[in-house]
């Protein structure tokens, strides 16, 4: 894997592992608690993150077939990324784009979700490992609102997206009604 992608991916993996360890020691009641019917539980936050990552990877896997036709990222995609990441840093709740929506399940198990996310990140690693510097600069990823990004920009967006939800995890755990066991 080229160095810039390797560094960004390592940063993503550390972030994910830290987030998982925030929730690992909690009971299933705590992990699946929702403050209200319209909110996500801790594990549903993880499912949302995985859904967004899965859909992004699936899209890019298809787009790579025509990579020679794609433009490279530049100042415009850098500016769009800066704007998107600025929005993610605001303490505002956004409706998830359709591509990141998921069908809630009756039951969630932390170990199953962790294993699914581990597998998904292995697939990401294998995908990223195939790119040289030139092809990694192509605008492969498409955010539903902010448009196309190259691979480094995509990994930076994913980091900010996860970070946005790290704050949500903290709010859930700090909620006065959060189950204590």
Predicted feature descriptions by range:
Residues 1-17:
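Extreme N-terminal tail/first-helix region
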Residues 81-135:
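Acidic/histidine-rich alpha-helical segments that form the ligand environment
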Residues 2-3, 40, 101-111, 149-153:
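Short coil/turn segments at secondary-structure junctions
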């Amino acid at each position: 894997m080229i160095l810039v992608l390797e560094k960004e991916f390592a940063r993503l993996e550390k972030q994910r592992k830290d987030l998982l360890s925030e929730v690992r020691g909690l009971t299933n009641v705590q992990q699946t608690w929702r403050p209200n019917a319209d909110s996500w539980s801790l594990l549903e936050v993880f499912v949302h993150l995985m859904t967004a990552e899965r859909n992004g990877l699936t899209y890019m896997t298809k787009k790579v077939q025509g990579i020679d036709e794609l433009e490279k990222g530049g100042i415009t995609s850098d500016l769009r990324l800066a704007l998107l990441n600025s929005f993610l840093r605001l303490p505002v709740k956004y409706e998830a784009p359709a591509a990141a929506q998921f069908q809630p399940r009756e039951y969630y198990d932390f170990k199953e979700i962790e294993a699914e996310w581990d597998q998904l990140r292995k697939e990401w690693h294998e995908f990223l490992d195939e790119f040289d510097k030139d092809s990694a600069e192509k605008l492969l990823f498409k955010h539903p609102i902010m448009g196309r990004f190259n691979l480094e920009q995509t990994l930076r967006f994913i980091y900010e997206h996860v970070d946005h939800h790290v704050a949500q995890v903290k709010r859930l755990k700090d909620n006065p009604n959060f189950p204590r066991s």
